């Protein structure tokens, strides 16, 4: 759902007014323990155009190339964090793509590489995101990305989706030079919001991020859009659902 600017401005203004009233009432009544939501990127960002672009450019090979690319994206991030050799997610994503092309024996020209990387700057939000974010704001909840994405990558999604004004400052892992699930990354939410861990919901997309957030101490909601299996890491999310409407219900339950 891409809101036109007039409709969005009206909804956002209403949400801020309602937030001021409702947040005070909720705290006074002791109804909800939550005061903010920190989002991983992908509960908000729809990554499917990347897969579509891969198949368009490399028919019959797109799925294999994409699988290797995604795996190496996160493995490279984790390895760089463990080794103290941080590079931002844009660089990690490009390096992972180059490896994936070699591993799948696909000849990737510089122009093709650039076109695939550009897809990340063209991504938009999932259709259920805009109304859900307005509902969360109206319930008095503060919102921010806490993501491995760079700030320019997050800014692009917000522009592409017409979501200006809903999120606070981006908490990109670039700020601490450590990718999730490093505790330094999750700590950004506590520091930025100025709240206790138990007052901040972490909205995760991947099972490993559920585990990382739970280990850190956040109440964690798994936005399991792909119906993925839970990881065997000894933790269970506090809530789970297929979309942001489920997160809204969890965050605003009395």
Tell me what each language-model feature is.
Residues 31, 139-141, 193-196:
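Glycine-rich phosphate-binding loop signature in dinucleotide/nucleotide-binding domains
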Residues 51, 66, 70, 90, ...:
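An amphipathic alpha-helix signature
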Residues 77-114:
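A metal-dependent, Asp-based hydrolase signature
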């Amino acid at each position: 759902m891409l809101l036109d600017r007039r409709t969005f401005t009206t909804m956002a203004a209403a949400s801020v007014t309602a937030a001021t009233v409702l947040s005070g009432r909720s705290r006074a009544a002791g109804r909800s323990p939550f005061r903010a939501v920190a989002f991983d990127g992908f509960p908000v960002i729809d990554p499917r155009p990347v897969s579509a672009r891969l198949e368009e450019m490399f028919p019959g090979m797109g799925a294999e190339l994409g699988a290797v690319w995604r795996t190496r994206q996160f493995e490279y991030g984790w390895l760089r964090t463990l080794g103290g050799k941080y590079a931002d997610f844009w660089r990690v994503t490009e390096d992972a793509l180059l490896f994936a092309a070699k591993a799948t024996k696909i000849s990737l020209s510089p122009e093709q590489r650039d076109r695939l990387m550009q897809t990340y700057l063209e991504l938009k939000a999932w259709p259920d995101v805009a109304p859900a974010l307005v509902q969360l704001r109206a319930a008095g909840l503060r919102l921010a990305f806490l993501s491995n994405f760079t700030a320019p990558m997050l800014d692009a999604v917000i522009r592409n989706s017409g979501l200006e004004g809903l999120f606070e400052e981006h908490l990109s892992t670039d700020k601490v030079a450590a990718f999730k699930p490093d505790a330094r990354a999750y700590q950004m939410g506590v520091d930025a919001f100025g709240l206790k861990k138990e007052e901040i919901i972490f909205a995760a997309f991947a099972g490993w991020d559920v585990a990382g957030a739970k280990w850190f101490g956040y109440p964690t909601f798994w936005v399991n859009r792909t119906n993925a299996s839970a990881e065997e890491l000894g933790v269970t999310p506090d809530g789970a659902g297929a979309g942001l409407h489920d997160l809204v219900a969890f965050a605003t339950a009395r």
